């Protein structure tokens, strides 16, 4: 950063001319990869108006995840392509919406709704195995439980760990957290590395 207390955007601009190819892992019919955890940065997207209109834009009634919902819907009507390198900086801070705790896992609800609506296949017949989808849900449940265990409600954490355990995700850790959730007072301690 330049001298001083802030950095004007012009000082952070880098030459992106070397990013002329698409990243094959992040390009194509991405629906199943999005279901399985691929993230798309909203701040770097260029979306055709026809795609935006076809999916009806953002669902602003959602409390969280409206951008992920947007990408899932978009991936059903058009291929998506990503450049082969970083093109933006993204700051994540503790007060952002992605860190707000909720009793329910909005991501689990979103993933289940997408799979019920569209199944586990792209329009080009790439599929996500049902077991892989269940593992994805289990990871999301585990993460939801872990966050609630350390910064939220132990009862919610316990229920989320039970869901993860039923799918066989990190069984020993799930059992330990389930047991500890009965005794650990809220707000004490710091989270260890997951």
Segments from the language model and where they lie:
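Conserved nucleotide-sugar donor-binding catalytic segment
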Residues: 5-107
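C-terminal, non-catalytic tails of nucleotide-sugar-dependent glycosyltransferases
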Residues: 13-29, 46, 108-136, 188-194
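Catalytic core of nucleotide-sugar-dependent glycosyltransferases
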Residues: 86-94, 99-127, 150-166
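Membrane-interface aromatic/basic loop that binds lipid-linked glycans or pyrophosphate carriers
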Residues: 145-194
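Phosphate/oxyanion-binding loops and surfaces in catalytic or ligand/nucleic-acid-binding neighborhoods
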Residues: 77, 81, 114-117, 185
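Proline-centered turn/helix-capping motifs that create local helix->coil transitions or kinks
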Residues: 1-6, 121
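Solvent-exposed, amphipathic alpha-helical segments
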Residues: 51-54, 144, 148
